[in-house]
């Protein structure tokens, strides 16, 4: 198992990145804005006189960088009466050294006004935070004007530093409940820094001492699992304490173990298997010593209350099976069994250094329409990609079905006709875009962890009469959390609405890769993406998403050069839409 890309992939990645970074060049579409009498605004703070927007690998302050030559980039201010003729980069493991002109690690001086450079100093160490800043000199002044200090933190830079084993449970691909895993350990010394890296075949949610690590959803991003799996590194220093500590992991199927059936045959993927993961905790103590804690068969596992999950359809949850405190110290894990060590499912693990999927907004229903004593339809203010959060108390064993859709029929009931026609269910146990929740009799809360949907309306039906209101169900919008970088407005209300609708549609189709729709397919259609990219990059900093996706192209390309029309894919798409209209994405996206 490799922890770095091979040289061929590195060459492709560097080419792709350079092209994506140069996307700022103006195209003919820019002139169309002028012809329409509109204005395109940049969000750049022109009043700044110091360098700004410092990034490493296209991300501000990333954690988990796994290359020895990270790309550093920044923006320089526009000086009205002077010009920049030299840029200096200073880097150190000690932020206090950067307060002056000292650097205990690396510095570089470049003539001109460059806005990016690749680190070329001495080898970086794994699990180490590096601080850096940018300064510039002008033609008229020798004084250097510095930026604020930024940083990046490395992850695992060598397989020699990886101590975790791949582990799974005793079940096969047909088993439906999602597993819990836990590991209890003792800390007897004071910690300076604790970094936890996890890579999973399937989706994961990570917690430490009962607290969720990070604010990401649907990690790791979708890849061709046989060839590449992404790892995620979290700084968990603040979550640990002296004495007993517990790491908790819940695994979901994602695209790895696709138990739903549709026309693209993801259930027949060559990689398909029961979800598994590998993880390690790197501890640096205040006395200067370090320690690794990795996954192995000593970890314990059992079933979670998630009794079914599909990235494509929905999630089913039995609140009666909840295990309060399962990922916290003091929990009695009697009855749990040991995890099984297993083989690595992939050739390569790469760090997921990109804008993650996050919750970006919440919406209360504009209407909660009661159909009868056991059926309600929620109307939300906009069509979104995401999930719903249910908070309800009802009779123990009552089954709620939350049917998400974009249309209503003439009776005001959710109509799935526009989104479920590629679905090929083998029975009625996995209804499309329909979460199923079995109530515990107490106050229950449910929000899917391993699924997302496209919807504006939700039909909630109950197996027994129940009283619901608009407070019981909230719509949660999520997507790859790419920063907005452009703003557009005009004197035309219609054009302004079109711009807002375009952005909403673009974001609803950005989940670690560009998709065609967040409900019917969730596929990375190459043709759809190259049509949308120019508009997308004018409005959002999505370069890290497209760079990851271009690496997916490298994984999917056949030896004869053929690419599928959906990327990633399991088997479908190599003999359909292979002309320039679709395959040209391999050139248009980097451009």
List where the protein language model places each region:
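C-terminal motif of bacterial Sec signal peptides marking the signal peptidase cleavage site
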Residues: 41-42
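Alpha-helix capping and inter-helical loop/turn segments
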Residues: 540-541
């Amino acid at each position: 198992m490799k922890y770095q890309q091979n040289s061929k992939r590195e060459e492709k990645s560097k080419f792709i990145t350079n092209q994506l970074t140069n996307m700022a060049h103006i195209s003919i579409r820019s002139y169309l804005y002028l012809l329409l009498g509109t204005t395109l605004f940049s969000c750049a703070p022109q009043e700044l006189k110091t360098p700004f927007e410092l990034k490493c690998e296209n991300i501000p302050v990333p954690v988990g960088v796994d290359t020895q030559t990270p790309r550093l980039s920044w923006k320089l201010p526009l000086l009205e009466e002077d010009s920049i003729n030299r840029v200096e980069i200073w880097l150190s493991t000690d932020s206090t050294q950067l307060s002056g002109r000292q650097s205990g690690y690396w510095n570089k001086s470049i003539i001109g006004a460059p806005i990016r450079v690749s680190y070329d100093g001495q080898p970086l160490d794994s699990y180490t935070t590096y601080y850096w800043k940018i300064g510039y000199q002008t033609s008229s002044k020798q004084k250097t004007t510095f930026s604020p200090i930024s940083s990046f933190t490395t992850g695992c830079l060598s397989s020699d530093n990886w101590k975790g084993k791949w582990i799974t449970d005793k079940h096969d691909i047909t088993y439906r409940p999602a597993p819990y895993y836990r590991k209890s350990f003792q800390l007897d010394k004071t910690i300076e820094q604790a970094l936890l890296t996890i890579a999973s075949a399937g989706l994961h949610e990570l917690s430490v001492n009962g607290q969720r690590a990070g604010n990401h959803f649907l990690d790791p991003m979708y890849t061709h699992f046989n060839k590449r799996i992404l790892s995620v590194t979290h700084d968990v220093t603040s979550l640990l304490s002296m004495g007993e500590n517990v790491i908790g992991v819940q695994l979901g199927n994602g695209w790895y173990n696709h138990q739903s059936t549709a026309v693209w045959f993801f259930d027949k993927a060559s990689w398909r298997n029961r979800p598994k993961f590998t993880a390690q905790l790197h501890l640096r103590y205040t006395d200067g010593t370090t320690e690794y804690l990795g996954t192995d068969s000593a970890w314990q596992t059992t079933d979670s209350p998630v009794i079914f999950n599909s990235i494509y359809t929905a999630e089913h949850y039995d609140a009666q099976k909840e295990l309060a405190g399962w990922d916290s110290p003091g929990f009695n894990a009697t009855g749990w069994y040991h995890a099984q060590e297993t083989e690595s499912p992939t050739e390569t693990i790469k760090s997921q250094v990109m804008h993650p999927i996050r919750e970006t907004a919440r919406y209360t229903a504009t209407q909660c329409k009661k159909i009868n004593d056991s059926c309600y339809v929620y109307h939300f203010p906009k069509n979104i990609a995401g999930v719903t959060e249910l908070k309800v108390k009802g009779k123990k064993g009552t089954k709620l079905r939350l049917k998400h859709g974009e249309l209503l029929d003439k009776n005001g009931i959710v109509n799935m006709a526009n989104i479920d026609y590629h679905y090929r269910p083998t029975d009625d146990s996995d209804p499309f875009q329909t979460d199923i929740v079995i109530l515990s009799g107490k106050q229950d809360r449910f929000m899917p962890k391993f699924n997302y949907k496209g919807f504006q309306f939700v039909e909630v039906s109950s197996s027994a009469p129940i009283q619901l209101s608009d407070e019981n169900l909230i719509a949660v919008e999520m997507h790859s959390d790419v920063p907005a970088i452009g703003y557009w407005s005009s004197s035309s209300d219609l054009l302004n609405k079109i711009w807002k609708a375009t952005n909403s549609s673009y974001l609803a189709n950005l989940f670690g890769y560009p998709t065609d729709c967040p409900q019917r397919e969730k596929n990375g259609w190459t043709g759809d993406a190259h049509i949308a990219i120019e508009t997308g990059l004018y409005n959002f900093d999505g370069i890290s998403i497209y760079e990851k996706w271009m690496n997916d192209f490298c994984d999917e390309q056949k030896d004869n050069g053929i690419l599928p029309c959906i990327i990633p894919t399991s088997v479908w798409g190599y003999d359909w839409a292979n002309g320039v209209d679709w395959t040209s994405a391999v050139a248009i996206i980097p451009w």
